[in-house]
Design a protein with these regions (language model features):
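Sec-dependent bacterial lipoprotein signal peptides
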Residues: 1-23
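Short solvent-exposed beta->alpha transition segments
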Residues: 49-97, 101, 107-110
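Exposed beta-sheet edge and beta->alpha loop/turn motif
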Residues: 95-151
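Short, low-complexity N-terminal intrinsically disordered segments enriched in polar/charged residues
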Residues: 4, 21-46, 54
Length: 151
């Protein structure tokens, strides 16, 4: 075999291996982002806010505290009286290096859209979460209250 043909084959093989490794890392990140976002959503929308806050960045804790301060005992009773808990499904994940944008569909959740008023149960809604990678761990990064669009 000609030396240049060997060189081309070696470079091609190296490129293919690099793409395989990159896609494996990407698949690993996709799975980790999906698991984090779904676990956060399941806890957040079922008012298990302590468990949800563990999955957040440090700067998100003030927004978790803000949300918790606006949940009344009546809201908790309404959620607990539901036959089915809130369910979250991930519809899209867009990863860019150490950040990710996740689109989530939520079913059977408490909609708290006005301060000072009790929440109400909603059948279905959509929201978007931002996640950040901190020391190899994906965490939800809240920059304000979660905005949910009711469907």
């Amino acid at each position: 075999m000609d030396l240049s043909v060997k060189h081309i084959l070696l470079v091609t093989f190296a490129c293919v291996m690099a793409m395989c490794l990159a896609s494996a890392c990407s698949l690993k990140d996709d799975a980790a982002v999906e698991i984090c976002a779904k676990n956060f959503g399941q806890n957040y929308f079922n008012l298990r806010l302590c468990q949800a806050s563990i999955l957040c960045t440090e700067r998100s804790h003030k927004w978790m505290a803000f949300y918790a301060s606006n949940i009344s005992q009546e809201d908790v009773n309404v959620v607990n009286a539901q036959a089915d808990s809130a369910l979250c499904d991930i519809s899209d994940i867009d990863i860019d290096s150490d950040s990710a944008r996740v689109k989530m569909t939520v079913q059977n959740f408490l909609m708290c859209d006005s301060i000072g008023r009790h929440g109400r149960m909603c059948k279905k809604g959509k929201c978007e979460l931002i996640l950040r990678k901190e020391v190899e761990t994906w965490k939800v990064d809240l920059n304000g209250p979660i905005t949910i669009t009711e469907e």
